[in-house]
Amino acid sequence: LHAKHGVGKSSVVKQVSEEMENELGKSVGFWDVRLSQCEVGDIKGMPHLDVDSGVTRFLKQEWWPTDEDSHGILFFDELNRASKDVLQAVFEICLDRRLDGKKLPDGWRVVAAVNSDDEYDVVELDPALHDRWFHIDFDPTPMEWVDWARGNDVETACIEFINRNQNLLDPPVGNLEAGRTYPSRRSWVAFSDTIKQMGLIDSPESGMLTQVAKGWVGREIAVM
């Protein structure tokens, strides 16, 4: 999946796993692995000595499926923000469906997401990995987000605002200023959750509502 940050990549992949579960009538696993936060040991596992064989083996991470009859999705997010060592470990899973000799069960699918090339702090992927994937540009329209928001308990006031100001759903195109707060689909949902929890809708505490808006979706929107 190719998309801007905060567009809901992990949410839509998790939703797919839930739909698979309904279709199969059995449990379907879902693991969201944020590669930008991983070291190589977080992928390969921790080394330990197999006393019986005298060979060093790797203890697999919690997310590695061990049931051969299981189904699920391994979701590697922020693939193009991972370190080179982490990428090499992920390559083996993505290309060979194996990790240190352990086979990924046939019922599991591997999905990865990358942040758009126009965002900062991303690396160019090796062509050997790039051409092994089916690529999807994930860019739902603002109205598609509005439809999704209506079905996912997003505050009505937020939905109506985006319906009138569709250009303010996402951060602006181009280089973003470090340290500055911009709107994103993820931050709009977080803003919605916060104002509902604090009871700020139709509240006389308009100053507090403005401050919360600044913190989640940026100063420019907060003063509108």
What positions do the PLM features span?
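AAA+ P-loop NTPase catalytic core and its hallmark functional loops
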Residues: 1-164
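Alpha-helical lid/collar subdomain of P-loop NTPases
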Residues: 152-224
